[in-house]
From Swiss-Prot:
It is a multi-pass membrane protein. GO terms for cellular component: plasma membrane. It comes from Zymomonas mobilis subsp. mobilis (strain ATCC 31821 / ZM4 / CP4). InterPro entries: Membr_insert_YidC, Membr_insert_YidC_N, YidC/ALB3/OXA1/COX18, YidC/Oxa/ALB_C, YidC_ALB_C, YidC_periplasmic_sf. Required for the insertion and/or proper folding and/or complex formation of integral membrane proteins into the membrane. Involved in integration of membrane proteins that insert both dependently and independently of the Sec translocase complex, as well as at least some lipoproteins. Aids folding of multispanning membrane proteins. The chain crosses the membrane at residues 10-30, 330-350, 351-371, 423-443, 478-498, 523-543. Residues 35-61, 560-579 are annotated as: Disordered. GO terms for molecular function: membrane insertase activity. This is Membrane protein insertase YidC. Pfam families: 60KD_IMP, YidC_periplas. Interacts with the Sec translocase complex via SecD. Specifically interacts with transmembrane segments of nascent integral membrane proteins during membrane integration. One of its GO terms (biological process) is protein insertion into membrane. It is found in: Cell inner membrane.
Amino acid sequence: MDDKHQQRNLVIVTILSALILFGWSFVTKHWLSTPPAPTQQGKNQPKAELTAEESGDKPLKPVDQVLQETPRLPILTESVEGSVNLKGLRLDDLTLIRHRETLAKNSPAVRLFSPAGTENAWFTSFGWTGENVALPNADSLWKADSDKLTADHPVNFYWNNQQGQIFRITLSVDHDYMFNATESVINRGNSPVIVQPYVLTNHQGVFKTASSWTLHTGPIGVFNGSVNYHVDFADIDKATNNSIRNNTQGGWIGFSDKYWLTALAPHNQKIAIDTDFRSSSNHHYQADFTVAPVVVAAGKTASTSVDVFAGAKEVRVLDRYRDQLHLPHFDKAIDWGWFAIIEKVFFYYLDWLFLHVGNYGLAIILMVFTIRALIFPIANKQYASMASMRRLQPKMQAVRERYKNDEARMRQELVTLYQKEKVNPFAGCLPMFIQFPIFIALYKTLLVTIESRHQPFILWIKDLSAPDPLTPFNLFGLLHFTPPHFLMIGVLPIILGITMWLQFRASPQQLEPAQQQIMSFLPLISVIFMAPLAAGLQVYYIFNNLISLAQMMWLQHRHSTPEERQDRAERKRPSKKKA
């Protein structure tokens, strides 16, 4: 293999990486995904039947209006703010103050939870099922022993059934996104009662970001030590009784959007729980779990502690909860995919660079320099092998001519020649294969991590996780029309195509005219392929191409013979026209 393949290798890397990325994701999703845990049937389920307002029988109302209809207790930390609904004791008002909806300066914070009766309603609540005992429900009014929930001040909520039992929920929240609820039943009656604690999260409709081969959104959980990505909202609708139940020891269950997550877990990961995904006819989806029934003797108190994550899927935060709270595979609430180890290495290095330089685009460029420096010894050997192959061309051609009627003998003699001259004809392929995991890892890192969301680079690039927004087909926004999808080719993909064309032109032109014509179209194909991908990925490949071009020119000079250098110099001289 010689330098004429350099440009083709880069295009092959891009195309094959895409095939691996989308094809392997399809295979793992449909054939290699974790099998569902056995479906369990039981009598006791969380009592979260929807009222007429919640079930969609009434017109939806603005969030601000609904928030004023019930008594509330404020929530305020450095990461979240909102309120607890004292009617039914629900977490149904929560915004993530570290994240904004859009890039606009006046953009509101991302709203995660909204009360029932509003658009995109999403809430979490706690409760009990039981026998021979009056239980709190969605209309019960709870009392609090404080006027605000903060990271430093938990709040106790009480409800008295006036029959001898007091229900208490102690709610706390940390400085990020983890709530803890201790559900207690204080039995002051004369006889024992049986209760079964539960926690649920309820979401109206499906997420805007649909689940795909490359990114799972929707129902998610860890059951008996295995992450389950295989359930979609549609699967719940099609299930028997619109319910998918699992019995598991520990684990967690919830709903995951691209960047946001609500997850429910027993604080004690050694206990058994019954989990359930279910839906109503009007597309309310619920994830919940119950623990084993508890007999509360007269004069005794029984308590169960549950954890509720409600927030952004920040990588370091999820990793910390996985380790500190022993939540199994909690970091995999981010759908890293099959190449998770490589992707997390990329993420942590990118994040480290970003913390030092303050610009995510610059961090990507520095990562390019790092990777090119690491593989430079391989590239050096590659070009040395290519130079040896070029010098060997006359002998190879002689072997082909001598044994042109005997393919087997010709291959044998060529192998003998390679061994004698100590040349590896496949040495030029290694850098190409190294770029496979790099492409896939960076693609997934920019796709699934919230840390790259809304990260600017320079000039018009305001979000490196999104495609380049400018296109020459509407004069970069001066013309008030949106080009069709196939014409949404931004400036960065065009620059990327130019750098690929420069690489092609800088390579020794030893191709046949027909081959050269075909190769000249490959940069255009890559432009079209890369256009809908994240701008950060395009920035990576632009600078990767430029550095690769500089390395290629230097290595060509270093490993070329005097005759080859003279030939290149003559080709650069302008030809003189005859008089």
